[in-house]
Amino acid sequence: PCETGCNRNHIDTTINIHAVERYIGDEAINKQWEVKLTAKPTGKRVLIVGAGPGGLSAAYHLKRMGHDVEIYDAGSHPGGLLWTGVPDYRLPKEILDAEINRIVKMGVNIRLNYKVTDILTEKDAGNFDAVYLAIGAQLIHAEEFPQDRSVYITDAFSFFNEVKSNTSPYIQKKVVVYGGGKLALYISRMIKRFGSDA
């Protein structure tokens, strides 16, 4: 949005903010920049439930404010939808892992494969002062489709998980993708890459 209002446009062209952010992000990874923690430790402990974009972002900012931060996530890898719902050609795993590692190096502890079922019990057991819920966008809104045994139906996140875990997903020669958002487009492109018609 700020690019459209950039006064540089009156001279030549607006500043490509996305390209500037990309360059800085690449430099941070390539030169292994570390985040400097300047705030005094508060002695407060915060539990974040969910290691997706929201949870990781909250951990980054809370740690910079001087709080002790732990993240619990039911998944086997941090990143949430960035890990399970964005194809590698859009966001390579190495880049995502590097960004997550920068947060871990700040002193944020991430506990994986751990599902929180009782928030108050976890808060008390871990002596946390606050809990931030960042459970994200993993819920599936399934539609009911009539089908026979020759038709295979799956949801986008299950499909992405199969692809991300390097297991070959079951794909028929002709595939119907139900949906019209970015996720449907990602799925369609991936299906084409596997050699099927979408």
What is each model feature region?
Residues 1-38, 104, 112, 122-162:
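Glycine/serine-rich phosphate-binding loop and adjoining beta1-alpha1 elements at the start
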Residues 10, 21-28, 63, 78-82, ...:
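Structural signal for hydrophobic packing residues in well-ordered secondary-structure cores
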Residues 12-16, 54, 63, 88-95, ...:
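Catalytic cores of large soluble enzymes that bind and process phosphate-bearing ligands
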Residues 20, 81-128:
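N-terminal Rossmann-like dinucleotide/flavin-binding domain of flavoprotein oxidoreductases
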Residues 27-65, 82:
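Extended interfacial segments that mediate partner engagement and assembly in macromolecular machines
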Residues 48-72, 112-123, 139-141, 157-198:
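Rossmann-like dinucleotide/flavin-binding elements
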Residues 67-83:
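Glycine-rich FAD pyrophosphate-binding loop
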